[in-house]
Amino acid sequence: MPNWVRNRMTVKFEYDTFKVIGNGMQILNFIMKPFCTEECVFDFEKLIPIPDSYYADYDPSKTLYPSSALSERALQDYSDYVGMGKMPENMDAERHKAMFTIGKQSYDNYQRYGAANWYDWCCKYWGTKWDACHAERTEREDCVEIIFDTAWSTPTGIWERLFKYLDNLLKVGYPGINCTIAYADEDVGSNTGEIIYSAGNISFTEDSTYSDGIARYIDVRCGGDCPSFYKDDEGNYHYYCEEYGGDCDKCPANC
């Protein structure tokens, strides 16, 4: 399983800019429709759809390629075939069939998109291997907050596309949208930061100290308060569990 990164996205708007659309909920639905499902879940495929060619109906059990290296081996066979102009040696009918299905599709995908398989494509274009997971959405009068998890990293490619969409709203007369993304890895104190979009301007902060990383972790993953951490007289955060080696009997934290 991956390390999960918790992402908290808050989208705010100025009511006067959008009041011609309707009430607060109607405005939120207007803003969010291009990247949320009808169930109000953040959907990466609405912003950057996975090409149909990555959904080919392959069955690894019917080929000689191990599933863990399926597309890579088939791609290599087909690449050798294209490069040499002849069939690789010692290839039986079953492997030959796989080469011209999985291998050819992987080769064509790489030539077109720079990624042979869905995993590489998602990492390249989304910035993470899976769509948003464990999503929750909270709506208020002038903003919406969506919290969701991603594998290994915050989805940088998705944020870039989202900001382009907000730029387009700005250009057609809908200013006043602000979007803030705070993220924190489940690995305490690491891989944390904040991205802010405001009226076409983007700022990115990657927390540079362990203490800042813990502060972000507490904010994003614990709702701003967690007994597992404490702040010293200089304002730096510390992790009880780390300092006491996981010995709960000695640790003063009430968690």
In which residue ranges do the predicted regions lie?
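Intrinsic low-complexity, intrinsically disordered or marginally ordered coil/linker segments
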Residues: 1-255
